[in-house]
Curated annotation (Swiss-Prot):
EC number: 4.6.1.17
SUBUNIT field: Homohexamer; trimer of dimers.
Top-level taxon in the UniProt lineage: Archaea
UniProt-annotated binding residues for substrate: 75-77, 111-112
UniProt protein name: Probable cyclic pyranopterin monophosphate synthase
Species of origin: Pyrococcus abyssi (strain GE5 / Orsay)
Family statement: Belongs to the MoaC family.
Function summary: Catalyzes the conversion of (8S)-3',8-cyclo-7,8-dihydroguanosine 5'-triphosphate to cyclic pyranopterin monophosphate (cPMP).
Length: 159
């Protein structure tokens, strides 16, 4: 089915029928980065951001976003998730977020992983915007970049 649009036919847009598919283990991992000034990274590491714990807030927001993916992206199926993990790694001038989503279902969870990582990064931006703004109220350094799916797994049972 590579190259064929499954959400569109001659009648218009539709949610793809997945009733005939087998329930199998699904996992997707998405990553993305937010570029921040090194001074902001230091404040986050030291827990000195006024709004509170940046990474804990971003984790919670990302997990909630994963659960709400079908409400945000209209043609995504509601999926009974079995687990979501959001982790962070620091660089000198960035934080890389990773969102891993797992489920046993009939369709993949890559959109959920992308939604989770993106909302986690947006939440970091929101938490640090007061210290990232320049004297004109702009964000010349701050940016979200390189959001992508790094792994997608579909495992059939060997029983």
């Amino acid at each position: 089915m590579v190259g064929r649009l499954t959400h569109v036919d001659e009648k218009g847009v539709k949610m793809v029928e997945i009733g005939h598919k087998d329930v199998v283990f699904r996992k997707a991992i998405a990553k993305g980065r937010i570029r921040l000034r090194p001074e902001t990274i230091k404040l986050i590491r030291e827990g000195k951001i006024e709004k509170g714990n940046v990474l804990a807030t971003a984790q919670i927001a990302g997990i909630l976003a994963v659960k709400k993916t079908p409400e945000l992206i209209p043609l995504c199926h509601p999926i009974p998730l079995t687990g979501v993990d959001i982790t962070f790694e620091f660089g000198e001038d960035y934080i890389e977020a990773t969102c891993e989503v797992r489920a046993y279902y009939k369709t993949g969870v890559e959109m959920e992983a992308l939604t989770g990582v993106t909302v986690a990064l947006l939440t970091i931006w929101d938490m640090v915007k007061a210290v990232e703004k320049d004297e004109h109220g702009q964000y010349p350094y701050t940016r979200i970049e390189d959001v992508r799916v790094v792994e997608k797994i579909k495992t059939y049972s060997t029983q």
